[in-house]
């Protein structure tokens, strides 16, 4: 009697949880999370995993749910799979099946009770602003071009420093959030100018839906003297969400990394990912006339 080839899944004696250090260029994606009619990073990644482990349903979990157009240098993702593929081999195998705009830096084995989102102790985001007079094609996908005035970094730092600690940030939470509360702890803030580029970094235990983009738009208003530092602080402390309307564009935002009690990767995915354009000098001479300084009036 002839035997038919079996389509059953091969035996897997040890279910495994794999963690990935992930980078993606967010311009072509509707965000991390799978959507019915959108091209998401999650959908692309799960499709690639299913090609390698087609015998079980695949579900991925991420440290941060980035929005449309937002980039990631150190996103962390986990999924459960069988033991046919060694943990370290998942990274090269997935890179051979993913679009070039998504790269897996490293893949490691984690305990079954470890979770990419719930085990994280912090996330760190960077927002990049191009504050030069002339637009630059090669900066456009990675930064927000604001050129009306030279940003006042001193005022912006004052506004940022007031946010440190545990607070209710519901003024910086977009409608549609599923969170039960809006309290989170801002652990570190940093603002650096290098030539025409201004970099803002914020590290927190967690972020609300749309928080960074809403915050950055208000911060730029402070830097352009359209909003006082005091009014900025009153808006979020008094939860005046109706006064926070504008959001900064997604393409200037990057998830730098997620942190855990113990470092899980042998090389951090974000370590050698300093954007090349942030290190560049301003336009070569002859320099254009300087931008006008922001006036002291508050609008």
Curated annotation (Swiss-Prot):
One of its GO terms (molecular function) is tRNA pseudouridine(38-40) synthase activity. Keywords: Isomerase, tRNA processing. The keyword Isomerase applies. Its EC number is 5.4.99.12. The active site is at residue 67. GO terms for biological process: tRNA pseudouridine synthesis. CDD domains: PseudoU_synth_EcTruA (cd02570). It comes from the Bacteria. It catalyses: uridine(38/39/40) in tRNA = pseudouridine(38/39/40) in tRNA. Substrate binds at residue 125. Formation of pseudouridine at positions 38, 39 and 40 in the anticodon stem and loop of transfer RNAs. Homodimer. Belongs to the tRNA pseudouridine synthase TruA family. This is tRNA pseudouridine synthase A.
């Amino acid at each position: 009697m002839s035997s038919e080839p079996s389509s059953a899944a091969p035996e897997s004696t040890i279910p495994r949880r794999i963690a990935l250090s992930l980078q993606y260029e967010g311009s072509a994606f509707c965000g991390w999370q799978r959507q019915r009619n959108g091209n998401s990073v999650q959908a692309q990644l799960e499709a690639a995993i299913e090609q390698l482990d087609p015998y079980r349903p695949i579900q991925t979990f991420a440290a941060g749910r980035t929005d449309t157009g937002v980039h990631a240098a150190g996103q962390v993702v986990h999924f459960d799979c069988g033991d046919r593929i060694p943990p370290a081999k998942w990274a090269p195998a997935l890179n051979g099946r993913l679009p070039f705009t998504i790269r897996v830096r490293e893949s490691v084995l984690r305990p079954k009770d470890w979770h990419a989102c719930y085990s994280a102790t912090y996330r760190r985001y960077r927002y990049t602003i191009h504050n030069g007079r002339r637009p630059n094609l090669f900066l456009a996908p990675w930064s927000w071009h604001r050129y009306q005035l030279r940003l006042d970094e001193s005022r912006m730092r004052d506004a940022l420093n007031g946010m440190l600690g545990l607070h209710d940030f519901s003024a910086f939470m977009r409608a549609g959030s599923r969170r039960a509360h809006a309290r989170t702890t801002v652990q570190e803030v940093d603002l650096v100018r290098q030539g025409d580029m201004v970099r803002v970094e914020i590290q927190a235990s967690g972020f609300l839906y749309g928080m960074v983009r809403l915050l950055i738009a208000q911060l730029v208003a402070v830097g352009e003297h359209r909003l006082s530092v005091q009014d900025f602080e009153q808006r979020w402390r008094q939860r005046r969400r109706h006064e926070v309307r504008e959001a900064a564009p997604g393409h200037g935002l990057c998830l730098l990394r997620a942190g855990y009690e113990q470092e899980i990767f042998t090389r951090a995915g974000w370590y050698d990912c300093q954007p090349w354009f942030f290190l560049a000098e301003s336009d070569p001479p002859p320099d254009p006339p300087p931008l006008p300084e922001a006036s002291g009036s508050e609008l």
